[in-house]
A protein has these predicted regions:
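Catalytic-core regions of hydrolytic enzymes
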Residues: 2-6, 11-116, 122, 126
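Active-site-adjacent mobile loop/cap segments within catalytic or ligand-binding domains
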Residues: 3-8, 16-19, 89, 99, ...
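Hydrophobic, Leu/Ile/Phe/Ala-enriched alpha-helical segments that form helix-helix packing faces
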Residues: 42, 87, 135, 139-143, ...
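Active-site-adjacent substrate-binding region
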Residues: 127-154
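Short, charged, low-complexity patches
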Residues: 27, 31, 128, 132, ...
Length: 211
């Protein structure tokens, strides 16, 4: 069977600071747009696509405590548990998870950092590493290297709940920097959006075809 692709569309709308300095770009909207477009392409290609949440519906927010940190932790826990529920339902070996984000170099003001990176958890399996490399190679193919040094493995390692607490191979993509004016122009353009979606699609398909 073809892989089941689980798409996690990043932060909720109430996550503070996740917008460009000029407030013309909001990460949660970008994550959802990429996720939905990617899901449609994968479905058309014959993959089963699942989401950690659907569209603008944000899980459990109406049930969460008022303490903001507790909200974030509960939402994040909901999302990685949802991935593991899908793994149990469809078989861990049949599932892949990609968590879609956009990056920022600082908490305020315009910055110099540019480019896309693909991240894995500290406990990443060989499958996750191979998956990350396949997607990052497509980022390079789309011209998204930016001005950062590229690790030899073509992936970055970080403490990430969506990668470390999920049972299937999992990656997290940080697509360009919304606090860099040049990257922001790409993120806001239709051409740039299509390239980002294609990067994910081609990377996923190439990885699946390599198995």
């Amino acid at each position: 069977m073809k892989k089941v692709i689980i798409i996690d569309m990043g932060h909720g709308s109430n996550t503070p600071g996740k917008c460009s300095p000029d407030r013309t770009f909001f990460e949660f909207r970008f994550n959802r747009t990429v996720g939905v477009k990617l899901g449609k392409m994968l479905t058309q290609a014959g993959y089963k696509v699942l989401y950690t949440w659907e569209g603008d519906k944000e899980p459990l927010y109406q049930e969460l405590p008022t303490l903001y940190k507790a909200q974030l932790n509960a939402c994040l826990a909901y999302r990685y548990r949802k991935v593991n529920e899908y793994c149990k339902q469809y078989g861990t070996k049949n599932c892949l998870c990609v968590s879609i984000h956009s990056n920022a170099a600082a908490n305020s003001g315009w910055q110099n950092a540019r480019g896309t990176c693909v991240m894995i958890g500290r406990n990443a399996s060989d499958a996750s590493k191979k998956f990350a490399k396949a997607v990052y190679e497509q980022a390079l193919a789309q011209g998204f290297k930016g001005n950062r040094c590229v690790p030899s493995g073509h992936y970055w390692v970080q403490a990430l709940a969506m990668c470390e607490k999920t049972n299937c191979p999992a990656i997290l993509t940080e697509n360009l920097f919304y606090d860099n004016k040049d990257d922001l122009a790409i993120l806001k353009s239709e051409e740039g959006m299509n390239k980002i979606v294609k990067m994910h699609f081609d990377g996923i398909v190439n990885y699946c075809n390599s198995l």
